[in-house]
Amino acid sequence: MTDSDVAADPQEPDSLSWREQAVARSLDSARLRAETRVQRFLDAAIELFNSGSGKDFTVQEVVDRSGQSLRSFYQYFGGKHELLLALFEESVRTTTEYLRVKVTDEDDPLERLHTFVVEYYRVCRPTPEQGATVPGRAPFMAEFAQQLLTEHPKEAARVFSPLVTLFEEVLDGAAAVGAVRAGPGHGPIVGVVLEAIMFNSFSSTIAGLSVDPGGQGTAEDLWDLIFHGIGTGATS
């Protein structure tokens, strides 16, 4: 085996998601059992988050709610940080799937971009009251994203890659019809726009305004701001 063969090994840790790394700690023969156990820990953590404790729950609380052992938890996760990463990764994945369905429903490339911006904004909105949910909502997405981007940029890049890929596809489609500016600058634009959508979803909270459950009006305002920043004016 050559050095290049080793480098190309698909099981390199950096190529695996946090959830996959947790499951990979188990023997292949027990993979299905490991998948089930990991999912039970993730489900327990989501329940705790939704119960109002946010991400301030303890590992022991997750263990107790999952009905499993502390020893089992540390078989799959190095600690609470890895559990939060796995949760956030699942949030990004489900959000990306939701957004892909929404943009696929649109035929016009510019309307696909419009739909992506508005729907992603709605997904990132803080829930104004218990029971008011948006399909595809990502638990603690904006809050944990800020911490992740600041303290662990390499991990953040991995976690956000599915969402970034989808947005690049949508942006390229709009550029192809001349609706937005084309060129090599799309890389920075992707990051700036995604960040603007995610963190502007809390603008009402910052300004001390009441939170609109749907957030549609504010989402459209943000779309106007973004489009006038990157649009060409060729398509209305």
Predicted regions located by residue number:
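N-terminal intrinsically disordered/low-complexity leader segments
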Residues: 1-36, 234-236
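Amphipathic, non-transmembrane alpha-helical scaffold segments
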Residues: 34, 38, 84, 88, ...
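Helix-turn-helix
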Residues: 40, 48-82, 86, 90
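An amphipathic alpha-helix signature
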Residues: 42, 114, 118, 164-172, ...
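Hydrophobic alpha-helical connector segments
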Residues: 86, 100-130, 187-190
